[in-house]
Amino acid sequence: METTIAAISTAMSASGIGIIRISGENAMDVISRIYRSKGGKKKIKEVPTHTIHYGYIYDGEELIDEVLVMIMHAPRTFTGEDTVEIDCHGGVYAMQRVLDTVLKNGAEIAEPGEFTKRAFLNGRMDLSQAEAVMDVIQAKNEYALRSSMDQLRGSVQKAIRDIREKLIYHIAYIESALDDPEPVSYTHLRAH
């Protein structure tokens, strides 16, 4: 994907923590423009993948919020792209200011479901797993959550793969029976 997207990933209501997610080829450039470590010396673009860093988000010289920033380099991310998650204070205004600063520095607002769409397009999940993400979010009871999590872990894909293997076996068996004039035992076919 050519664009870098961002969105608030938590509910837009007052809470202890709010999460802003950035994903795309310029995610590291965006965060490097707005993040400063506590000592001001750490260059966020140079840190290892899958690490968390304490610091501040600035809009120019204006301090916006105290944050934790998680850096995740492609391809081992949800979307398969470079990804940054900013954990800021969960006030509605604080989250919006951090998001606005991210957008002002090179990201575009994500459409609903766009992170999952990118994960699908980048081969990080199949269609049934992409659908399961929304099912997990909307689960209202234990059964719904468990079922959705099974689907997210690939249970539908595994079932389809098993059926496909059986079909291939049966087709090969039938084709060999058609090629060979000797009688074929269909009890062997039923056993599979």
Model-derived segments and spans:
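Flexible helix-coil linker/loop segments in the cytosolic histidine kinase module
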Residues: 180-184
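Core structural elements
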Residues: 124-128, 163-177
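A glycine-rich (often HGG/GG-containing) alpha/beta subdomain
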Residues: 1-146, 150, 154
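Conserved small/polar residues in nucleotide/adenosyl-binding loops
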Residues: 187-192
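Amphipathic alpha-helical coiled-coil segments
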Residues: 152, 156-163, 167
